[in-house]
Swiss-Prot record:
Keywords: Cytoplasm, DNA damage, DNA recombination, DNA repair, DNA-binding, Endonuclease, Hydrolase, Magnesium, Metal-binding, Nuclease. The lineage of its organism: Bacteria, Pseudomonadati, Chlamydiota, Chlamydiia, Chlamydiales. It is found in: Cytoplasm. The keyword Hydrolase applies. The active site is at D9, E70, D145. The RuvA-RuvB-RuvC complex processes Holliday junction (HJ) DNA during genetic recombination and DNA repair. Endonuclease that resolves HJ intermediates. Cleaves cruciform DNA by making single-stranded nicks across the HJ at symmetrical positions within the homologous arms, yielding a 5'-phosphate and a 3'-hydroxyl group; requires a central core of homology in the junction. The consensus cleavage sequence is 5'-(A/T)TT(C/G)-3'. Cleavage occurs on the 3'-side of the TT dinucleotide at the point of strand exchange. Its EC number is 3.1.21.10. GO terms for biological process: DNA recombination; DNA repair. This is Crossover junction endodeoxyribonuclease RuvC. InterPro entries: RNaseH-like_sf, RNaseH_sf, X-over_junc_endoDNase_Mg_BS, X-over_junc_endoDNase_RuvC. Homodimer which binds Holliday junction (HJ) DNA. The HJ becomes 2-fold symmetrical on binding to RuvC with unstacked arms; it has a different conformation from HJ DNA in complex with RuvA. In the full resolvosome a probable DNA-RuvA(4)-RuvB(12)-RuvC(2) complex forms which resolves the HJ. It is an enzyme of class 3 (hydrolase). The gene is ruvC. It comes from Chlamydia pneumoniae.
């Protein structure tokens, strides 16, 4: 039986998610992926509600074993940081309600796991995710969030199987 890992790249306009199946001998296979697209015309509370409902549906349908997110960061605009933090909270709540294990990695750790360098561009992440999992759809510019979500899930599989890590 394979283990399912969901990576989530939360956002207030687009939230990408990607589930990989970890097969025997750590072979990775794309299981399910997509983007929850939220209209900027919607009031923010309605976007959070929609994010929660749609992500909850994905989690209920797929029942992943673990969820992976980027660690919180602070950007130059405090208002944007707060909005993103609330979206992260919605994602964390959806996972916690279902007793899904939650793991967090810094963006540069996820990039290094997939591309080999921590300061890789979004495009480099898309290209490597496409090659690793044979998912050409992530190369489309509108699917950056899905590629980031895949990168987080891939990163977790690398860290979790490391004998130097106490995650497993």
């Amino acid at each position: 039986m394979s283990e399912l890992i969901i990576g989530v790249d939360p956002g207030t306009i687009v939230a990408g998610y990607a589930i990989i199946a970890v097969e025997q001998r750590y072979q990775l296979r794309p299981y399910s992926y997509g983007a929850i697209r939220l209209s900027s015309d919607m009031p923010l509370p309605m976007r959070y509600k929609t994010l929660f409902e749609q992500l909850s549906g994905v989690l209920d349908d797929t029942q992943p074993n673990a969820m992976v997110l980027e660690t919180q960061f602070v950007n130059k605009n405090p208002q944007s940081t707060m909005k993103l933090a609330m979206a992260r909270g919605i994602v964390l709540l959806a996972a916690a309600q279902r007793d899904i294990l939650i793991f967090e990695y810094a963006p540069n750790v996820a990039k290094k796991a997939v591309v080999g360098k921590g300061h890789a561009s979004k495009r480099q992440v898309q290209v490597m995710v496409s090659k690793i999992l044979n998912v050409p759809e992530v190369l489309h510019p509108s699917n950056e969030d899905i590629a980031d979500a895949f990168a987080l899930a891939i990163c977790h599989t690398h860290v979790a199987r490391s004998p130097l890590c106490g995650v497993r």
